[in-house]
Amino acid sequence: MPGGPGLLQALCATTFLLFLISAGGLGPGSQALWVDGGPPSMTVSLGETARLQCLHNRSRLSSKLNITWWRVLQGNATWPDIFLSYGKGPNGELTIDTVNKSHMGMYRCQVEEKDLNQKILSSQQSCGTYLRVRERLPRPFLDMGEGTKNNIITAEGIILLFCAVVPGTLLLFRKRWQNMKFGVDAQDDYEDENLYEGLNLDDCSMYEDISRGLQGTYQDVGSLHIGDGDVQLEKP
């Protein structure tokens, strides 16, 4: 076969060269640029600080990364995204201080990898995170832990039990001491005081008026002065 051995050697050399190139491209420091998709949403309260991170991994150690944050406008897909700021720190963080209702929306980060000549080698962007803003939760009147609340309830129960048992016990001991000191006489005097309890005073006055009226119809013989003897005494 004409040119057979030479053609076979050329194919082997080409295959070996392609293998070396691919091995060098997949070696350390030559991996592809990677950007995390990020959380689908984030919820913060009014007045708080929102922090969005752009996790990424560069493909070359000598390259330079440019991280920017963009806000996606809602309602029309043809509208361009609004540039917000550059990412700060190793994770390209976006910080929004004193969040209000106007900050609600979709945010995404974009990572551009450049070489020493500021040439863009690759570019990736996150899927986007929707920022939700809610009303601040009302602060409870007693802002304390559950353990502290349980201790307070236990102390209140002990105090209530003390206030209910101790006065009753003292009254019982006082009554017992009075009975032992004064004896039965005090009880008899108390009964004598209540001997006429329930007696109707109006009935008593009526009987008293009747008795007084009867006394007026009789005459005392001893004190009667008889003159001429024609005085007649009434028989009872």
Curated annotation (Swiss-Prot):
Q: Which residues form the Ig-like C2-type domain?
A: 33-122
Segments passing through the bilayer: 152-172
Subcellular location(s) of the protein: Cell membrane
Q: Which residues does the UniProt site feature Required for binding to BLNK point to?
A: Y218
Describe how it is modified after translation: Phosphorylated on tyrosine, serine and threonine residues upon B-cell activation. Phosphorylation of tyrosine residues by Src-family kinases, including LYN, is an early and essential feature of the BCR signaling cascade. The phosphorylated tyrosines serve as docking sites for SH2-domain containing kinases, leading to their activation which in turn leads to phosphorylation of downstream targets. Phosphorylation of serine and threonine residues may prevent subsequent tyrosine phosphorylation.
* Disulfide cross-links: C54-C109
| Sequence ranges on the Extracellular membrane side | 33-151
**InterPro entries in the record:** Ig-like_dom, Ig-like_dom_sf, Ig-like_fold, Ig_sub, Immunoglobulin_dom, Phos_immunorcpt_sig_ITAM
Q: Domain ITAM: where?
A: 185-213
- Membrane topology, Cytoplasmic segments: 173-236
Indicate how the chain sits in the lipid bilayer. Answer: Single-pass type I membrane protein
Question: Where Phosphotyrosine occurs along the chain?
Answer: Y196, Y207, Y218
Q: Name one GO cellular component term.
A: B cell receptor complex
- Is-annotated flag, keyword Nucleus? no
**Residues with PTM Asymmetric dimethylarginine:** R212
Subcellular location, principal: membrane
Q: Which residues are glycosylated?
A: N66, N76
Superkingdom as given in the UniProt entry = Eukaryota
Recorded domain comment: The transmembrane helices of CD79A and CD79B chains and two IgM heavy chains assembly in a four-helix bundle structure that appears to be conserved among different BCR isotypes.
Oligomeric and partner information: Heterodimer of alpha and beta chains; disulfide-linked. Part of the B-cell antigen receptor complex where the alpha/beta chain heterodimer is non-covalently associated with an antigen-specific membrane-bound surface immunoglobulin of two heavy chains and two light chains. Interacts through its phosphorylated ITAM domain with the SH2 domains of SYK which stimulates SYK autophosphorylation and activation.
- What is the name of this protein? B-cell antigen receptor complex-associated protein alpha chain
Species this chain originates from: Canis lupus familiaris (Dog)
Q: What is the lineage of its organism?
A: Eukaryota, Metazoa, Chordata, Craniata, Vertebrata
